[in-house]
């Protein structure tokens, strides 16, 4: 089946002019998240046990957090890509699924993974032993990040979720250390927004060729139009520098994981938002409609402003997409209102086995919480 998403997967909620909002199954005044919101709602409502999803900046992990599900973004290169495109969003985007159990997550990962020679990012496959028989036999060193990489305020509920998970991991004999952000989160997010703009412009260039005409404002939603317009103005040399910065981010995190096995953060800063909570004001909408009239720097500032409120809601997820690391949202916390808000575990590239072994520890000790969990 096919599930609802925001147009081209640009948002951390699922709404749109075509099919409307995706409701959080247990509170229809709230959004199920995005961009894989329809998939999350299908799983959390019990329609299906597993639903395919993709994650270019948190689009699996964010709805997992809101819906009380397990959401794995695999390592770059783990899941097959192509043949139409081999580097979705320059490697930031990964395909996988939303699930309810670690068992299902492991099995799906084992059978979907591939060592893909023609891929620009081939990755050695995980063995059956590493996925199904590996267990944590010695204390882990876990870095705890309490602050937002975007310098935005972290909610008391997000802090509570981190503390609960940290306390549990500490009780199991692991060593946890509160650390500073290893990357410049604002800079990394700006590169991410620029990438989205350029890739949108490239996508519409192909669409124009297939349609035999130019794209118009009426062909797409406002936020998509703004991305399309701004992406056409970015210089090739600046895009090259952007991609080089991603390689530097990845190198920094590889060194970071020489000292730490895992990173623990909140998966989202808040539970599921209300429908319409991130609607843009009329002044900004007018500016976005006339995006082509602004300079490149002004356009990038407007893109940031366009996503500012929603980014503050979910500031923790984008960096693993840039570095290629595997990252996992698990349902370990309920807010005072009884709404899910997950935590996020991130490992070194290729270490999904470690992520899932730790997730299984939470699961076996009945640490998973949420309206749907069985």
Go through each PLM region and give its residues.
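Residue-level signal for inorganic ion chemistry
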Residues: 105, 142, 169, 242, ...
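A short helix-breaking turn/cap at a secondary-structure junction
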Residues: 73-164, 186, 366-374
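Acyltransferase
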Residues: 154-181, 204-215, 239-260
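Short glycine/serine-rich loop segments
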Residues: 1-112, 326-333, 339-342
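Charged, often glycine-rich, active-site loop that binds/positions anionic groups
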Residues: 16, 20, 27, 188-203
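Flexible, acidic loop-helix segments that line cofactor/substrate-binding pockets
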Residues: 120-126, 140, 145-147, 179-194, ...
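Short, well-ordered beta-to-alpha junction loops that form the rim of enzyme active sites
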Residues: 3-5, 10, 147, 181, ...
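Glycine-rich, small-residue loops and helix-cap segments
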Residues: 234-374
């Amino acid at each position: 089946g096919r599930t609802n998403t925001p147009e081209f997967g640009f948002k951390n909620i699922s709404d749109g002019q075509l099919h409307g909002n995706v409701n959080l199954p247990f509170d229809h005044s709230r959004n199920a998240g995005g961009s894989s919101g329809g998939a999350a709602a299908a799983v959390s409502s019990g329609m299906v046990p597993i639903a395919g999803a993709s994650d270019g900046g948190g689009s699996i992990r964010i709805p997992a957090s809101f819906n009380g599900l397990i959401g794995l973004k695999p390592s770059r290169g783990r899941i097959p890509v192509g043949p139409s495109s081999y580097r979705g969003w320059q490697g930031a985007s990964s395909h996988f699924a939303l699930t309810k159990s670690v068992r299902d997550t492991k099995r799906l990962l084992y059978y979907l993974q591939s060592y893909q020679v023609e891929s620009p990012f081939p990755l050695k496959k995980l063995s059956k032993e590493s996925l199904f028989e590996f267990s944590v036999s010695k204390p882990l060193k876990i870095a705890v990040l309490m602050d937002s990489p975007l310098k935005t305020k972290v909610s008391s509920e997000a802090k509570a979720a981190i503390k609960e998970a940290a306390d549990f991991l500490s009780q199991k004999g692991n060593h946890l250390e509160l650390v500073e952000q290893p990357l410049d989160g604002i800079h990394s997010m700006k590169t991410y927004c620029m990438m989205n703009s350029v890739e949108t412009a490239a996508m519409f260039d192909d669409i124009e060729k297939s349609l035999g005409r130019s794209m118009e404002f009426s062909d797409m939603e406002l936020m998509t139009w703004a991305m399309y317009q701004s992406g056409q103005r970015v210089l090739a040399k600046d895009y090259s520098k952007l991609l080089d910065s991603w390689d530097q981010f990845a190198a920094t995190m590889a060194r970071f994981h020489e000292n730490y096995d895992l990173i623990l953060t909140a998966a989202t800063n808040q539970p599921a938002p209300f429908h319409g909570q991130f609607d843009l004001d009329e002044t900004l909408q007018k500016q976005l409609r006339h995006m082509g009239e602004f300079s490149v720097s002004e356009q990038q500032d407007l893109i940031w402003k366009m996503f500012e409120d929603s980014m503050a809601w979910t500031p923790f997820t984008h960096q693993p997409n840039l570095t290629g690391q595997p990252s996992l949202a698990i349902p370990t916390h309920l807010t005072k209102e009884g709404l899910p808000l997950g935590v996020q575990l991130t490992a070194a590239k290729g270490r999904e086995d470690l992520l899932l072994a730790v997730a299984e520890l939470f699961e076996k000790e009945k640490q998973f919480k949420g309206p749907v969990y069985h």
